[in-house]
Amino acid sequence: MTTNVQEMFGSLLLDKKIVASLTAMGFEEPSPIQEQTIPLVLEGSDVIGQAQTGTGKTAAFGIPVVQSITDHRHIQALIMTPTRELAIQVAEEIGKIGRTSKIKALPVYGGQPIDRQIRALRSGVQIVIGTPGRLIDHINRKTIKLDHIKFLVLDEADEMLDMGFVDDMEEIMKNLPAERQTLLFSATMPRPILSLTKKYMKAPKNVTISKEELTVPLIDQYYFETKDKIEGLCRLLDAEIDGKLIIFCRTKKGVDDLAIALGSRGYMAEGLHGDLSQTQRDRVMKKFRDGTADILIATDVAARGIDIDNITHVINFDIPQDPESYVHRIG
């Protein structure tokens, strides 16, 4: 398998330690965004990537960042994400990529005691992944120092814009060293994001993954019409589904209402949305991971970054408003 990975990633000029990590993670060949992005980052370019969740974009920036930094104790890469869940998942994946290179990644986000994060930062990490607000908090406390930053990554930049983080994003960007690489990934390119790219990026190279490449051919997709959605859902759960599943609703109230409705019918269902505290969110995810609950009902933003093995079904109880959100959900 190592030989196969080396052959498939060979043209990307990856070192043996990275290849060993990718082999352990089960990689076989680079995805389109990885194949296009990794060489650009390794050659020193800024990159704008238009890609969704499910395309392998975390590894597309994680692999070259890990290869390009050292195991010195200071922070050399900063990655901004819109949600806590995505920060955690990105940190976990980059931690796996960097394991054989002794590169450590730490997620920082609101809702977790900041003292615990400060202790972890002082122990020495090379990559910090976090939500903009908590990153600014650490920067103001000087527990995150920007002097040695070589890479800034903006992951799901349009989502951060939608959540009102654009001022925080710019506050961080304008205080970073001028000599750095900036990598920005976004499903869409609204005007404020384009403005950031023009102001803070140097001759960026563009990587765009077409909508055809975004779809996942191994996923069977079905559409059901029913007069009573809850009754129709329950019949589907009873007749067809045996395993873990995620159900998407458009609103927080929709999540709560459906969780109550399914719970009253005896289903082991838990709801996840942005009004939950971090402790509540962690408890919900623990139940879903360990099988105490086998149905997770979530909003789009709350579900970003969720990485659970053995999910057999995704149900769109409410149809998303755009095709990109649909791909985010099922991918």
Predicted regions and their residues:
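Conserved helicase RecA-like core
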Residues: 2-330
